[in-house]
């Protein structure tokens, strides 16, 4: 049975973060925080910018993210999920410091051929899983406003853009130029023009489809999924991605209240 928080008169919104650095800014502003530990995860209930929320870390990888998402729906009764994180840029024109708001997700490491076409999820009859259009549009608008804000523009990414499109997920950190090229070309050959690559989103998308829960995802591009990815990643998350997540979610929740 879902746990309905006494802090919230309406169903809470889940705000998922991929990494602790991204969650810190949100935690600092959480009003009436209340921690519940479930499934070896800490879930923080409270209010943020006028909205009842549950904050959680997805943990890393598809299975971990699916477990967290299921717990949010089953245990806390959330009916909307928003996920912030970082990703490697794959698409042409997608550069470090940009943001990609997902329209769909695909698993780049799923291959049940010859029983099913490569990338197709068995028994679902599809390879791609759609994000909620209305929620994603709000997130796109919030991202655009946040990136235009002086405090972010002055952080060295004044030319940062917001993109919309397909993101690929898989259980490996793509960090080589050759690996990145092979992945991009293979997916394009199957009709999947991917803008970015990460490790959780497709699993969240599949769980949300199963439960009929709307969700939206934004990913800050931390690297180009090439040979420098492992070097760029830690510094970028600490210095930039955490500020992006905080600023974008703030604007998103304010827009939702209006």
Give the positions of each predicted feature.
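Proline-aspartate-enriched helix->loop->beta-strand connector
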Residues: 78-82
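N-terminal short beta-loop-beta anion/metal-coordinating cradle
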Residues: 2-70, 76
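A C-terminal functional module that forms or caps the active site or interfaces directly
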Residues: 170-226, 230
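Active-site-proximal beta-strand elements of phosphoester/diester hydrolases
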Residues: 54-59, 166-168, 218
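His/Asp/Glu-rich mid-to-C-terminal helical/loop segments that flank catalytic regions of hydrolases
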Residues: 225-258
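Short, acidic/turn-prone active-site loops that include or flank metal/cofactor-
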Residues: 39-41, 60, 104-107, 221-223
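Mid-sequence, gly/pro-rich, charge-dense loop/helix-turn segments that line enzyme active sites
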Residues: 90-191
